[in-house]
């Protein structure tokens, strides 16, 4: 399939392990993994002129106990394994910790911990191998996003180790290591499109509150402003301080203090969210749209869902379908990368049916499902079902999800609700975290 291609976006984790989740639970040997890497050489030899942009995630270390996407023993020891990593990392940096490492170790089965540390070592070894492939010219660009990252712990230590190798190989300007994961395919497609057009679009970042620059979003380990710089660069764009000169504007809704989970925004609204100047943000966006500027919204006010108040303001001001992009899902980094990619698509392709459909899917999934419907449906699950197991991809649960999303649209998106058709709602992993949603936007109102 690559013989006649101009470019390849390659997930090294998929090539080596079969995917992101399999990369956390595999028992592959280094020899097997190294043999799989050889495919990259074969592809390069067959099509020497094809651009190859690769990405490979640093294995995460969640701060909770669950085996939903981790090894089985993580359900019992996950929190303790994470906390032990934090204490070990701080100790190496000369930072005192209030928790004694010995007490944590007493709670963890040593065989399980050895397995976990061994898998991390194998994955880190393969991260370095991929760096060598870049150094030797087998791939053209490499991004190493850190999945569900934090400032301290096993994942942060791995990141430091990999950064040392990047410096040793003199590739600081070639390898980007930053918070993210699920959005990186979109980011690299954006970069490839920009490179093939010979352009480096200018991006102006508009904050809802200036203090947001310095916050460290949930599940990440860098200040927001630095993560934004990485994502803009990784997408083949450049940041500008002048919105007049910008090719598109990235509107960022993050708070000026600690980020909260989206599911609690309607019942436990934190006062510091009031520091955001949303009226000024809306007026700014309206004026830029009048000037025919592309505006894309990175709705990272909360983690794991969109800001219902902000979506309401977009609806109230007839802006929902005038913006060039919207995202508000999972981590702040996932949201940022998606919003940038939407803007790049709009820059080259303009408005399209596919773009509009994706936009309304974001409003219903990121705002509707993630922030409101997911929690409500979870509370009403039939006997025998729970958040992690709803027994089916389509059925009682997906039907209720679809019905509640339609209600959400009528209540929160009234300016476009009668133009939306939900053609699919399914639970692809038979759990509540994700929904497989397909929505069509009709330019004419439905009778």
Task: Describe each PLM feature range.
Residues 1-447:
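An N-terminal assembly and electron-transfer interface module characteristic of large anaerobic redox
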